From Swiss-Prot:
Keywords: Glycoprotein, Membrane, Signal, Transmembrane, Transmembrane helix. It comes from Dictyostelium discoideum. It holds the Pfam family Ig_TgrO1. This is Tiger protein I3. Residues 290-367 form the IPT/TIG domain. The keyword Cell inner membrane does not apply. It comes from the Eukaryota. Its main location: membrane. It is a single-pass type I membrane protein. The chain crosses the membrane at residues 831-851. Residues 19-830 are extracellular.
Amino acid sequence: MKILLFFILFYLFSFSISYDEVIPLGYESHNDSLVIRYREIENYYTNISFLWKGKSRYDMSFNCVLNNTIRTCTLPVKESDHAQMYSEEISACTENNGTFKMCGYDLPLFYFPSPLLISEFKPKTRGGNTTLSGYYLELKERIYVQFENSYRKDQFFYSGYVYLIPGVFQSKTPDRINLILKVYPGCGYRTIIWENHETLNFTYQEPNIEKIDINQSFLDITGTNFYNQSIFVSVKIDNNIIDPNDIISVDFEIIKLKFNYSDPFSSKFNVQVGCCDYWSSQFQITYPPIPSIVNSIPKLKGGLLIINGNRLTSSPSSSNNNNISVTVGDSICSIVSSSSNEIKCNLQPLSNSTFNNSSPIAVSINDVVNTNTLLLIYDTPYITTFSQVNDEIHIIGGCFGNINSTQIHINDKQVFGQIKSINNDETDLILKIQNQIYNFNISIESNSIKSNGINVDVEMYARINEIPLVSNKLINFTLFYVNSSNINLIPTIKIINEKSNQTSKSISTNVNESVVSCSFLIENNCGIINYEIEIGNQIYQSSFSYESPLINKCNLNSNEIVTCIGKGFVNKYNETSIFISGQSIALSKEINNSIYESISFQMNDEYNILGELYLNVCGLLSNKVNINTFPIFKNVSIPNLFDTNGGNIIIIGKYLNNNTNFTIECNGEQIIEKECKLNNSSTSLECYIKLNGPNGKTCKLLFNNDNNIVSTFSFIYKSPSINQTSIINLKQGGILTIIGNDFYYPIDKVTIIGNGNGSGNSSLNCNEAKYINDTMITCFIQATNYTFNNIKNGEMIFINVSTNGKSGISKVFKYLTQSDDVHQYSDARNIFQNLLLSILIIIIISLFISNI
């Protein structure tokens, strides 16, 4: 019975509670208000009280407004209210549609709006106390704050969907706006779930790289907001995520990983750290060039710098693989070449005002600059190597100074007069070998600084006594620095040639201390000969040259054979090449000449006989000469009839030129006046001969060198031609002027012909014919009543001129009689006067030209 009564009472209590339950539709949090919305039929809060048991109480009231079916209740919040809105418990009163329901029970935060944050909540990945700034953060004492688990493998999140952080804020300060929340370590994106099931999304602070130390094949990345669980940590190098197995250790401030960079190129990389997929900014690391050694150069001359070291160039795959620069102090060194371990560049001379004797070197490759210090120290002599050329030692190095001030030390003792030359760059010093010194240590002192020393072992060398002629078989050598153990042995020479190898012993040997004179018999040879002389255990290899071919002259004979006279020729056609104007001429047979002083070949039309000729004998070139040619005459061509004063002839032949010496005789008389010019290379001469007509002539062409007749030819002159005449009335008579060409002296006869052939009574003589010049004659027409049958007054009729057996006829004479109109006759007279004036002008011009 008691149990039944208990259940009845419990049911009634529960019903009363559920009946008074408040179920909001939504919330809004503002700086100056809290807003809660309800359905019209639901219970709603009218006021709330913040209670401290036995201490204090702070009451606040809602203003509720019904709008259709939604009731909105607003709790005004003044600035002074924020500090009071915090208690051990919250009491509330409720109504339903204006009817009081109840007051006094503890109100859970489940029914209240979420806190309003006024600044971003962004804890460090290490966690710890973090300021949470906002309003309504702690209306009542919290036990915990719920965090949603987005990263199942995070060791701080256990295995559930949420994890709990002890919720007592770390500060009891009356500042209710900035409260301290203890946060566990984490990274990336996280969510806080408030008591009303609304959420706050936030992220931990992004990782930040402060520095990266390169320690051989490891990288030590130092920064903030890394994470100490490697499963959530990634590293990118140039946007490529490295193998997780290369990450050695992780912590909140440092990450250590493997990165073995072994390329011989200078490079730079961008590094990023990611925690929970949130990435840091890029941080650049560089593997800079490492210049370690540099040669010295003269400060006032400049010179070639050779910088040795590591990573002295960029990767071939780099888009800027030519962006390399070297700066010495404030001066730019011009790049000559670069490789992974060497840079060569030219440095200009420094002014004498530069007092420092050293300058720092900066090598930049794609904007990556060396971090080590390398100084260029000026004017410090150094030796890198040497070579022996017969009795000279060529020392290679730098800063050798000049021949007047530089000192030579041999075996630490200064010697004098040994320097032969120092080049202008001070990089090559030549000195004579001291007699009888086989090995020594040499150093150079310049600018009061002594160079390093280098050991020199003098080797045997040979010198040919004279340049051998191609006909010589006996070759004489002198051997120097022969060891005492070999001094009495017989030297042997070996000729090293592609076509013939021969070995012979000296047939004559003379010894003077360490010098051996010897003679060898060698088969006839030519060109440059490589040889090896051996005496005992000493061997010397070198080469000598036979005399170069020398041409004195080359002549071309009448059979078109060129013969060159000189010396140094050989009697093997395959060892000799002939060139004319750079064109090679192949020899067709052996040169049968035992004295090596002449060579002949047949001249062909395709060779440029006017070009320079030279020989290539076994690779040695002769001097260049011009061929002495003699003209070859074939025939004479007459292209046109001769005019009054002469005409052109064309002489056909070969090897002709403007100065070809020949004579022309016509009818036993030598032609003095002739003008010739070369046509068509050297195969024809066109000559203008001044010889008056009219009779044709037979001529001879004679070659002046031997006065032989080389051709006979004939030519004829043109007949006279008539162009126009003056106008004369036959019944009055008068002087008739005839204009034309190719008139000859004397004039035989001038006839006016009616029918053109002079038959019957249709012709009239013009008497007293006179030769004026080759273009004009005159004659006199006696006044006559003669008429021409069938010829109308004013018509043109024929006129014929005969001179020295040649005649010309033309229809140019105008037939006029006395019955002609006076005006017509006057016009004719005017025309004739104009004609005479023209003739006079022509005569004056001709006289003027002839006097020039």
